[in-house]
Design a protein with these regions (language model features):
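N-terminal DNA-binding recognition helix of tyrosine site-specific recombinases/integrases
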Residues: 40-44, 69-100, 145-147
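Basic, Lys/Arg- and aromatic-enriched nucleic-acid-binding interface segment
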Residues: 98-149, 153
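Short, aromatic/basic-rich helix-turn unit that serves as a nucleic-acid recognition element
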Residues: 9-37, 67, 73, 81
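C-terminal secondary-structure termini that scaffold catalytic or DNA-interacting sites
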Residues: 195-199, 213-220, 305-314
Length: 314
C-alpha cells in the first residue's frame, strides 16, 4: 500500500485542530500537550523552511536531532513531542513506521522519598497563610495514598460520603475509594472554602470543591489550577529549605514527592507491591491484576491506616 503523503504544514494544522477538539471537550491538559507540541514543531519547520516538505522518517530524525542538539531539551521532553506528533500523524492515515527509529518511551526520572521523621517534622512546622495550606495539601496527598495535585484541586465535597473519598484519577480515569483518616478530615475542615468563606483571601473560591484552588469552570478554571500548581511547587521548595531537607540527603520537595513517599514508606512497612500499585490507582500493572481478584478496598484502607499510625501521622 502506498504511503499517504502528508506535509509538515498539514501535520502542524492537524495538531492544532486536535488541540482545539480537546479544548472543546474540556480535556484541557491534553489540549495543552498538543499546543506545546505544535509550538515546538512550528519553530522547527520555520527554522528549516520546510513547511511544504513531506513529513517522513528523515523529518523525524532531523526533528529529533534538532530537539537534542539545538534546543537541548531533556530526553523525556523529546519523547513527549514525538509521541504527540505520532498520534496526530497516525490519525491522519500516516504509517507509524516513520517513527520506528525515534525514542518515544519514557525514561524513569530519579525520585527521592521522604523518611518518616521528615513527614513528622513537616506536620509540626509552624507555618502561616498559604505556606500552611500548601504544606497541609502535601500531607493530605501523602495520607491519601499519594493523591495527585490535579485530583486534589478538582476534588469535590460531593466526593466525600460516609467516611470515604471516591473520585476518578484525572490521569487514568480509574475510580478510587479511600477511607477518610482523621488527619485527612482535619486538613479538609481547615481549608474548605466553606470554612474559609469569611476570609477575604479565599471568599471567591468555588464552594463545591474541597480545597480553595479553583474559582471558575471550564478553561478559566484549568488556568487557575495551573497557576496553583506552580505556586504549590514554589512553596514546597521554600518549605524544603525551612525543614532542613538537605540534612536528609534531599534537595527539594515537589508535587510528586508525596506520591513517591507514600509508595516507598508503604514498601518499607512491608505492604505488598500489589497493594501499593492498587492503592495508587496505577492502570498498567499487569502483574498486579493477578492479585486484584482477592484484593478489596478494605484491605488497602487497613494497610494505609497502619502506615499512617506507624509514622505518627494520625
Amino acid at each position: 500500500m502506498r504511503q499517504k503523503t502528508i506535509t509538515n504544514s498539514q501535520l502542524l494544522d492537524a495538531i492544532r485542530n486536535r488541540a482545539n477538539k480537546f479544548q472543546s471537550a474540556e480535556h484541557f491538559a491534553t489540549a495543552q500537550n498538543y499546543l506545546s507540541t505544535a509550538r515546538s514543531f512550528n519553530q522547527y519547520i520555520n527554522l528549516r523552511g520546510s513547511a511544504h516538505a513531506q513529513f517522513n522518517a528523515a523529518t523525524v530524525q532531523d526533528y529529533y536531532r534538532y530537539l537534542q542538539t539545538e534546543r537541548r531539551v531533556l530526553r523525556n521532553t523529546q519523547s513527549f513531542y514525538l509521541r504527540f506528533l505520532r498520534a496526530t500523524y497516525c490519525a491522519m492515515g500516516g504509517c507509524a513506521d516513520v517513527f520506528k527509529d525515534a525514542y518515544t518511551s519514557v525514561e524513569p526520572t530519579r525520585k527521592r522519598a521522604l523518611p518518616a521523621h521528615v513527614i513528622k517534622r513537616l506536620d509540626s512546622l509552624p507555618l502561616k497563610g498559604n505556606y500552611a495550606m500548601w504544606r497541609d495539601m502535601f500531607l493530605f496527598s501523602f495520607a491519601d495514598r499519594g493523591m495527585a495535585f490535579v485530583d486534589m484541586a478538582y476534588l469535590r465535597q460531593s466526593d466525600i460520603r460516609g467516611g470515604y473519598i471516591t473520585y476518578c484519577r484525572h490521569k487514568t480515569g480509574r475510580p478510587l475509594t479511600i477511607k477518610l483518616e482523621p488527619c485527612m478530615q482535619q486538613i479538609i475542615t481547615r481549608w474548605s472554602p466553606t470554612t474559609l468563606h469569611t476570609d477575604t483571601n479565599h471568599s471567591n473560591f468555588h464552594p463545591g470543591y474541597v480545597f480553595p484552588i479553583i474559582r471558575s469552570s471550564g478553561a478559566k478554571g484549568f488556568t487557575e489550577y495551573q497557576s496553583a500548581l506552580s505556586a504549590y511547587n514554589k512553596a514546597l521548595r521554600s518549605i524544603a529549605a525551612r525543614v532542613g531537607l538537605a540534612k536528609s540527603g534531599l534537595t527539594t520537595l515537589s508535587s510528586y514527592t508525596a506520591r513517591h513517599t507514600w509508595a516507598t514508606q508503604a514498601y518499607h512497612a512491608g505492604i505488598p507491591v500489589s497493594v501499593i500499585s492498587e492503592g495508587m490507582g496505577h492502570s498498567t500493572e499487569k502483574v498486579t491484576r493477578i492479585y486484584l481478584a482477592q484484593l478489596t478496598p478494605t484491605i488497602i484502607d487497613r494497610y494505609n491506616h497502619t502506615l499512617l499510625n506507624s509514622i505518627g501521622f494520625r
